[in-house]
Every structure is written in structure tokens, then in C-alpha cells.
């Protein structure tokens, strides 16, 4: 199973860099974008100004005190948008899976791009090189197995840097970092964690999920997962439907992997049918497991090509399940979701090794099954492994 490969690209002091691009005589000076008057806040500052303590969102009047000889410029949003469009055109040369965060920042899922463009590091290096050579500004990039770690990596290598975090070194990378590096940990949460004796991400991992949930509510589950480098949020291009999924809470706990496999097959069949009804396919298979002790984990994998085939969904869901503690811990809930959806109006380049004949056979078989379900009711035809369980639990 291919490990997800996510790149986070963040332009360096974007607004200020565009101003320096258009006004090269200002290079080396403290350039502060946000307005010429004392009203308003700093939108961007050159690294010379940052060295004196100027930061984004700081009141202009404060920035003037820190940097009295600074060059204060008004915001030119149309110009920044123009450059941003060119930056994103470069991103889309490598993958259609680009999630903008702002004009100057984006996530890219390049899991399926490596066959054409080389490793994640090569892709990120080429993107940065193209941006600098064609636009005259610089960018920093972090590469990791998920969005959380890629974002932290790009933050740590600014300005004009590139940092790769191999999947098997994720925890080693995170552990020594201060808790403020974790998404979801703002000033209030940070102060509360410090009161619990927590300063680093390693310290967070010493706390149980129950303790974190008691102190931070639902955000406690997020902090618990992020401290372990777990982040299964997919890269979501704008306008894309988020996901289609189904989950089931059991009347009695599931104890064996074999029984869990049956329910994953059941869920995969239902999700696939819903996908076909919506005329959508999905690229990322996600599973959710909630154990009897209410600890919840998620796992995901991004496919080479989008699918609505129940067998393919189940195959990947089963492999993901093997990465959990199912079989050694009792389970009260299982879920399967497809995300990164592709609809008929969206173009998609098939994978180099896709078999169109096999895909067509699967499509016709699934259409036939859909016809039977539509005519005689949901669950009329089930995989043999499910017949007894579905009837026993009255599930359709």
C-alpha cells in the first residue's frame, strides 16, 4: 500500500515579496505591507522587518515603533491575486489535488504523481525552482505523510527551504517540538497544557485520551491524534464534494478481526452503492474505528485512480483495518468513507496501469446489482459472507 505523500507549499513573505519584485530598489530594506497610515494591521513584512520584531496582524502603529525607517506600503490585492494564480498554475502541473489555504499557501497530494515526476522531494524542489525562476519570488515546502506534519515542516524550514519528514521518522521529528506547533493548540490550550506539566509534543503523548478529552472536549481527541503524527484529513480541492460514508455502532462489541472484516465488507458495499447513486467516484478510502473504551482512530489511503467499486473499497479498507488494534481490542463502531470525490463534470486522467476492460466489467456488474436492489429492495443480493449477519441484525 502506497504511503500518502503530501506537500505543503508556503510563499515566503508573499505580499512583501511581490512588492520587492515590483520595486527592486527596496531590496534590503524593511518593507511592511498594510497601509501608510497608523490605522490597520500588518499584512506582510519582509524578513528585514521581521528581524526587528514586526509580525503579521500587528498594529501598524506598533510596527512603526519597532521599525521607524521601514517602508510602509498599501495592500494591492489584485496584484497579489495575479501572482497567486501563476503560482497555482505551477502546482497544477504536478497534481489536480491542490487545496488552497490562502493566496500564498496550499496543500498538494502527490501520492500518484511520483511515477511521472519523481520523488516528493524532487517534485517540491522543481515547484520551488519554477516559482523562483518564472516569478522571481521564493517558497518553502514541507513533505510528509500527512497535512499536519507537512505544514509543520514547511514552517520550520522558512524562508526559502525544503524539509522532508520520512514517514517512519514522523514521531522522532515531532517529539521535541513545543506544543504550540500542533494545530488546535492556541494560547488558551497551550496555557492549560503547561499547567498539566506539558511543554513538548513528547509530553502530550504521556497524557491519556480520556485526560485530554476531559480538559479540552472534542479537541482533546484531535490533540491526542496529532501528537502521535496521525492526521487522515485528505487534500480537498475547492468545490469538491467532501465525502460519502457510512458507519455502524454495534449492539454488542466486535472482538475478532474476521468479524470486523465482514462489517467492513458490508459498509464498503453500502458506500459504493451510494457513490454510484451520486454518480461519483472517490480517491481516498478512510476507515474509522471506535474501541469499547471510546478511543477513536482513523486510517486512510489515496488510490491511483478514483473508484466506486465495492471490492476495491473493501480491499483497501481491510488493509487499513490491519493497521489498527482491531482483533486485540473490543470494537463498538466501524466506519468507511470515500473522499476526494470525482464527479462526471470533472476530468480525470486514468492511471498508466489501469485496465479499461476490467473496469468496464466491474461497472456492468455493479449496474446489474443496483438494478436488483432498486427493484427488489436493498440487501436483496449480498456477498455470501454477509448473508447471515445482515439478516441477524436486520441491516439493509
From Swiss-Prot:
The active site is at 105. It is an enzyme of class 2 (transferase). GO terms for molecular function: damaged DNA binding; DNA-directed DNA polymerase activity; magnesium ion binding. Keywords: Cytoplasm, DNA damage, DNA repair, DNA replication, DNA-binding, DNA-directed DNA polymerase, Magnesium, Metal-binding, Mutator protein, Nucleotidyltransferase, Transferase. Its cofactor is Mg(2+). Binds 2 magnesium ions per subunit. It is found in: Cytoplasm. It holds the Pfam family IMS_C. It catalyses: DNA(n) + a 2'-deoxyribonucleoside 5'-triphosphate = DNA(n+1) + diphosphate. Residues 6-186 form the UmuC domain. CDD domains: PolY_Pol_IV_kappa. The record marks 15 as: Substrate discrimination. GO terms for biological process: DNA-templated DNA replication; error-prone translesion synthesis; SOS response. One of its GO terms (cellular component) is cytosol. Mg(2+) binds at residues 10, 104. Coiled coil: none annotated. Its EC number is 2.7.7.7. InterPro entries: DNA/RNA_pol_sf, DNA_pol_Y-fam_lit_finger_sf, DNA_pol_Y-fam_little_finger, DNA_polymerase-Y, DNApol_IV, IMS_HHH_1, Rev_trsase/Diguanyl_cyclase, UmuC. Belongs to the DNA polymerase type-Y family. HAMAP family: DNApol_IV (MF_01113). Monomer. Poorly processive, error-prone DNA polymerase involved in untargeted mutagenesis. Copies undamaged DNA at stalled replication forks, which arise in vivo from mismatched or misaligned primer ends. These misaligned primers can be extended by PolIV. Exhibits no 3'-5' exonuclease (proofreading) activity. May be involved in translesional synthesis, in conjunction with the beta clamp from PolIII. This is DNA polymerase IV. It comes from Desulfatibacillum aliphaticivorans. The lineage of its organism: Bacteria, Pseudomonadati, Thermodesulfobacteriota, Desulfobacteria, Desulfobacterales. The gene is dinB.
Amino acid at each position: 500500500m502506497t504511503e500518502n505523500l503530501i506537500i505543503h507549499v508556503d510563499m515566503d513573505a508573499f505580499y512583501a515579496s511581490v512588492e520587492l519584485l515590483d520595486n527592486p530598489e527596496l531590496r534590503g530594506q524593511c518593507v511592511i505591507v498594510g497601509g501608510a497610515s497608523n490605522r490597520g494591521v500588518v499584512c506582510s513584512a519582509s524578513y528585514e522587518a521581521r528581524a526587528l520584531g514586526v509580525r503579521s496582524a500587528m498594529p501598524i502603529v506598533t510596527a512603526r515603533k519597532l521599525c521607524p525607517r521601514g517602508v510602509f506600503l498599501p495592500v494591492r490585492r489584485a496584484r497579489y491575486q495575479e501572482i497567486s494564480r501563476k503560482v497555482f498554475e505551477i502546482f497544477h502541473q504536478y497534481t489536480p489535488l491542490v487545496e488552497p489555504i490562502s493566496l500564498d499557501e496550499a496543500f498538494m497530494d502527490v501520492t500518484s504523481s511520483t511515477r511521472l515526476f519523481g520523488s516528493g522531494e524532487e517534485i517540491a524542489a522543481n515547484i520551488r525552482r519554477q516559482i523562483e525562476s518564472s516569478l522571481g519570488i521564493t517558497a518553502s515546502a514541507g513533505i510528509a505523510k500527512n497535512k499536519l506534519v507537512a505544514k509543520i515542516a514547511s514552517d520550520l524550514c522558512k524562508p526559502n527551504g525544503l524539509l522532508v519528514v520520512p514517514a517512519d521518522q514522523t514521531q522522532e521529528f515531532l517529539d521535541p517540538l513545543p506544543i504550540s506547533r500542533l494545530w488546535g493548540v492556541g494560547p488558551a490550550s497551550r496555557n492549560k497544557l503547561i499547567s498539566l506539566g506539558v511543554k513538548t509534543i513528547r509530553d502530550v503523548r504521556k497524557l491519556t485520551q480520556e485526560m485530554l478529552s476531559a480538559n479540552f472536549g472534542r479537541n482533546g481527541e484531535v490533540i491526542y491524534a496529532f501528537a502521535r503524527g496521525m492526521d487522515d484529513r485528505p487534500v480537498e480541492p475547492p468545490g469538491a464534494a467532501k465525502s460519502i460514508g457510512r458507519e455502524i455502532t454495534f449492539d454488542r462489541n466486535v472482538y475478532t478481526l474476521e468479524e470486523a472484516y465482514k462489517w467492513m465488507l458490508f459498509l464498503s458495499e453500502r458506500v459504493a452503492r451510494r457513490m454510484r447513486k451520486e454518480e461519483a467516484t472517490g480517491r481516498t478510502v478512510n476507515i474509522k474505528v471506535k474501541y469499547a473504551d471510546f478511543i477513536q482512530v482513523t486510517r486512510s489511503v489515496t488510490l491511483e485512480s478514483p473508484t466506486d467499486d465495492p471490492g476495491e473499497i473493501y480491499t483497501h479498507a481491510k488493509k487499513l483495518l490491519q493497521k489498527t488494534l482491531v482483533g486485540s481490542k473490543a470494537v463498538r463502531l466501524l466506519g468507511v468513507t470515500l473522499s476526494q470525490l470525482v464527479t462526471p463534470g470533472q476530468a480525470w486522467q486514468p492511471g498508466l496501469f489501469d485496465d479499461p476492460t476490467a473496469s468496464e466489467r466491474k461497472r456492468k456488474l455493479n449496474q446489474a446489482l443496483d438494478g436488483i436492489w432498486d427493484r427488489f429492495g436493498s440487501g436483496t443480493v449480498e456477498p455470501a459472507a454477509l448473508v447471515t449477519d445482515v439478516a441477524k441484525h436486520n441491516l439493509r
